[in-house]
A protein has these predicted regions:
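Alpha-helical cap/lid subdomain in secreted, periplasmic
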Residues: 2-153
Length: 153
């Protein structure tokens, strides 16, 4: 929940794209799924309102909170992505989460090797097309006047 309060600081940098990965720490604490979803929606909206495209990193959690919680939690990310028209990384930690060789001793946070996999396999395939769209948009606005011009002789 702390990230929602820090978004103004993020928006001061005027990001074109923000990769948002929140909710897992709340789930570890057993925070109600509806509250987690509301916080994610608030964060996405604040970023969008600040002019940033959002890529939402989906999370999954261990089953220690029960199957109902796990299923409800997993459903948050695709639902928010669809409802708020944002790009989704289905599972941000795909290929890394749960692998002791790719995570620190806390079994939650990836190692350097784990992050390398996350970036190369999970982020870049989704981020690269978004960057290309932005580059095309910048090129279009640079070559086309934003308002009609009138010449007089």
């Amino acid at each position: 929940t702390g990230l929602v309060d820090r978004l103004d600081w993020v928006l001061q940098t005027k990001p074109d794209i923000t990769i948002l990965t929140i909710g897992a720490n709340d789930a570890i604490r057993g925070i109600d799924v509806a509250t987690v979803e509301a916080n994610i929606r608030t964060a996405v909206k604040r970023l969008q309102d600040g002019g940033s495209e959002v890529i939402l990193g989906g999370m999954q959690i261990y089953d220690n909170l029960g199957a109902d919680y796990v299923e409800s939690f997993a459903a948050i990310y695709p639902r928010v992505a669809k409802d708020m028209n944002v790009t989704l990384i289905p599972f941000f930690l795909e290929g890394v989460g749960g692998d002791p060789k790719l995570n620190q001793a806390d079994a939650i946070h990836p190692t350097k090797e784990g992050y390398t996999i996350i970036v190369n396999d999970n982020i870049l395939p989704i981020l690269q097309p978004e960057i290309e769209k932005l580059e095309a948009a910048y090129t279009d606005t640079a070559t086309k006047p934003s308002t009609p011009t009138e010449t007089t002789q």
